[in-house]
């Protein structure tokens, strides 16, 4: 996030002294908040300036809010965060998610690992950890089924015909896991990097595993699945987290 400080300052008509003040405040802000903005980190920043004078607080809040809005505008942040004068953190979500056209996800690409990860999430609603845990022995392409074994239990998921060729391609030479190196599953960071590279290559930068899973949820709901049915498909203990998608 620090790398955006200078472009942000350059986007504003500021005097030299104001530029120095902005730069100083934002460097402090980024040092405390880090690269990922969330409510807890903003509250940490709030506490760090709690004992300053009223004028200093207002200046730092104003600078931080302008920077947060800038990051939201350039789509570095998916949600708009704002610190208020009353020292409360307000978080405004974007519009409710809409179904996107996913045709491009199935087109030929050099980023085959990231493509398959994204398709398994889109087609089956899997989490990254569930994708990482897919074992070769539990994939039955003849009957188009995946038996998914997790700590929460066992789920048998149907595989669509369109997904089969992508799986066949990656199954060659695998010993234990679908995603592995000599029988050892890849790290969480490996999955994150490959997914990020693929979605960026097709023009969907910023589309996370969570958002891809949300696409599965939206499509299943549109197809007529009840909240209980969808909860079972996803392996959830309770349908509570799905309630927001079923509100009228």
Curated annotation (Swiss-Prot):
<dbReference type="GO" id="GO:0006313">
    <property type="term" value="P:DNA transposition"/>
</dbReference>
<dbReference type="InterPro" id="IPR011010">
    <property type="entry name" value="DNA_brk_join_enz"/>
</dbReference>
<dbReference type="InterPro" id="IPR013762">
    <property type="entry name" value="Integrase-like_cat_sf"/>
</dbReference>
<dbReference type="InterPro" id="IPR044068">
    <property type="entry name" value="CB"/>
</dbReference>
<dbReference type="GO" id="GO:0009037">
    <property type="term" value="F:tyrosine-based site-specific recombinase activity"/>
</dbReference>
<keyword id="KW-0238">DNA-binding</keyword>
<dbReference type="GO" id="GO:0003677">
    <property type="term" value="F:DNA binding"/>
</dbReference>
<feature type="active site">
    <location>
        <position position="213"/>
    </location>
</feature>
<comment type="similarity">
    <text>Belongs to the 'phage' integrase family. XerD-like subfamily.</text>
</comment>
<dbReference type="InterPro" id="IPR002104">
    <property type="entry name" value="Integrase_catalytic"/>
</dbReference>
<protein>
    <recommendedName>
        <fullName>Tyrosine recombinase XerD-like</fullName>
    </recommendedName>
</protein>
<dbReference type="GO" id="GO:0005737">
    <property type="term" value="C:cytoplasm"/>
</dbReference>
<dbReference type="InterPro" id="IPR010998">
    <property type="entry name" value="Integrase_recombinase_N"/>
</dbReference>
<keyword id="KW-0963">Cytoplasm</keyword>
<dbReference type="InterPro" id="IPR020876">
    <property type="entry name" value="Tyrosine_recombinase_XerD-like"/>
</dbReference>
<keyword id="KW-0233">DNA recombination</keyword>
<feature type="active site">
    <location>
        <position position="149"/>
    </location>
</feature>
<keyword id="KW-0229">DNA integration</keyword>
<feature type="active site" description="O-(3'-phospho-DNA)-tyrosine intermediate">
    <location>
        <position position="245"/>
    </location>
</feature>
<feature type="domain" description="Core-binding (CB)">
    <location>
        <begin position="1"/>
        <end position="72"/>
    </location>
</feature>
<feature type="domain" description="Tyr recombinase">
    <location>
        <begin position="85"/>
        <end position="248"/>
    </location>
</feature>
<comment type="function">
    <text>Putative tyrosine recombinase. Not involved in the cutting and rejoining of the recombining DNA molecules on dif(SL) site.</text>
</comment>
């Amino acid at each position: 996030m620090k790398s955006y400080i200078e472009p942000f300052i350059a986007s504003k008509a500021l005097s030299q002294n104001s530029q120095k003040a902005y730069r100083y405040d934002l460097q402090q802000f980024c040092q405390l908040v880090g690269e990922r903005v969330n409510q807890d980190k903003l509250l940490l920043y709030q506490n760090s300036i709690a004992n300053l004078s009223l004028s200093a607080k207002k200046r730092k809040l104003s600078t931080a809010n302008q920077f947060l809005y800038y990051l939201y505008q350039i789509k570095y942040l998916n949600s708009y965060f704002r610190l208020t004068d009353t020292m409360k953190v307000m978080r405004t979500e974007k519009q409710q998610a809409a179904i996107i056209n996913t045709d491009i996800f199935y087109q030929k690409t050099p980023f085959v690992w990231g493509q398959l990860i994204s398709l398994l999430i889109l087609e089956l609603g899997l989490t990254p950890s569930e994708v990482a845990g897919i074992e070769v022995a539990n994939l039955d392409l003849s009957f188009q089924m995946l038996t998914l074994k997790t700590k929460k239990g066992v789920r048998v998921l149907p595989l669509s015909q369109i997904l089969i060729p992508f799986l066949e391609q990656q199954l060659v030479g695998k010993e234990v896991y679908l995603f592995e190196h000599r029988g050892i599953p890849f790290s969480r960071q490996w999955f994150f990097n490959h997914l990020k590279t693929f979605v960026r290559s097709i023009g969907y930068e910023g589309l996370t595993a969570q958002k891809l899973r949300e696409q599965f949820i939206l499509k299943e709901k549109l197809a007529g699945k009840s909240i209980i049915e969808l909860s079972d498909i996803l392996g959830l203990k309770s349908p509570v987290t799905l309630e927001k998608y079923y509100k009228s």
